[in-house]
Amino acid sequence: MSRKGAWPIAVAAGAAGLLALAAVAAPAATAGTASSSTGPAAVPKWRITESVKTSANFTAVVATGRTTGWAFLGNGFNAAPVAFQLSGGTWKKAPFPGTKGDEAVIDAAATSPSDVWAFTEGTGTSFPGGTPARALHYNGSKWSVVKTFGEPIAGASVLAANDVWVFGTMGFTGEPALGAWHYNGSTWTQVSKTIQGGSALSASSVWGFNGVNVEHWNGAKWTATSVKSLLPPKANVDMDPQVVGILALSARNVWAIGNGQDTDEGGPTVVLHYNGSKWTRLAQANRGFAAGPEFSSDGSGGLWIQNFSPEAGTAYLLHYSAGKLTVAAVPDGPTKMAVYAVSQIPGTTQQLAAGETHASRNFGAGIVAVLLKYS
């Protein structure tokens, strides 16, 4: 994700608003007179723009321009991930060097249509039969593998072709975690062994999280700040509340998502914000497990956040705006659609999203992979 903070693909895998209305009429003039007309403003909404009947779902998406982007189809089981390229507003399948097995694209990020990155989750190579995670780059004409990691990737930030950050997830018991890695265009360097996700502003300003802490990298060291008091109270004996995603937009505008980790339904979900001096909790909703890295800015001060309640068979796309979390309207509703990734179209309040439709309250039946657009 490019400065953005996914639902684990093993369970199901780069968020945000009822946005500004667009003017739809232009003034007309005749000789000696002038007149203007104004039609009703178009109300933005989510709509499906691509559907693929398959047993898999779209796991990641990135907008690379107003009418360009990439999306990735797969479920991490047997078949290799498949890429779709958006050009001129039309999605088409494109060549991609995916590998069969437990590989799925967990995140995608870009700085331009000719600098696009895809990151596969992998299962880790610490145990027999495990698969590596990979970082792949598209230069405008072809994809190539840049780096292979022995542990799973959870997300990434891409600032330039020579400024790429990759973040791991919490390792299984007895398995090492990937931590945080930086790529300067020639060399990969591990800068943390404990960071579980992150979002970069520059090579010397990176935000990450680990459990109840948010951490900041200044180019030389990490500084941790506990936000435990801002998270929901512990709801069960099995899982602790924790930070699950972070999105840095500027030095004084950093967002984090926390979750209470209730055993069955997940939640509550909280929105945290850093204004350059302190962290505060701005909103809370009694919804399911908040998605990790791929939540998105809505381009107008809010967020789009993916959210899931597996036991209830529901998936919500939440919108944060002006201190409130609300459930966004999606084409098939929360019982028949799941959104796994959201990406802001650069310079706009429009969004691309990736996910699936499925049988009512059943993520495993009747799957149709879908791509959506908010405009």
Please annotate each region the language model reported:
Residues 32-375:
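Residue-level hotspots at or immediately adjacent to binding/recognition sites across diverse folds
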Residues 1-32:
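Secretory targeting and sorting signals
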